[in-house]
Amino acid sequence: MDLFKAFGGKSNSKDIAKERLQLLLVHDRIDTSPRFLEMIKEDILNVISNYVDIDEKGLRVEITKERKSDDTFISALHANIPIKKMKQVIR
């Protein structure tokens, strides 16, 4: 699912190619499918968009794998989600 189209924005082929390349690079780093990362991004956006308006063009979600001091590896999810404004949430 294209994040730009999901929220009514338009994307061009450059944006789509860039997003696909980023997903492939992450896939290579952590041995998971690009679709898995896309599903995580969709879920994060669905939850966060209940509380804030997000700038989808600046959205970056990636999973990295880093070596710890004991030579084991740990994966980490990094999300950079630019917030346009907070929504008024009544509970």
From Swiss-Prot:
Position of the signal peptide: none
Keywords: Cell cycle, Cell division
InterPro entries: MinE, MinE_sf
Highest taxon, organism lineage: Bacteria
SUPFAM superfamilies: Cell division protein MinE topological specificity domain
GO biological process: cell division; regulation of division septum assembly
Transmembrane feature ranges: none
NCBIfam families: minE (TIGR01215), PRK00296.1 (NF001422)
Function of the protein: Prevents the cell division inhibition by proteins MinC and MinD at internal division sites while permitting inhibition at polar sites. This ensures cell division at the proper site by restricting the formation of a division septum at the midpoint of the long axis of the cell.
Protein family: Belongs to the MinE family.
Protein name: Cell division topological specificity factor
Organism: Caldanaerobacter subterraneus subsp. tengcongensis (strain DSM 15242 / JCM 11007 / NBRC 100824 / MB4)
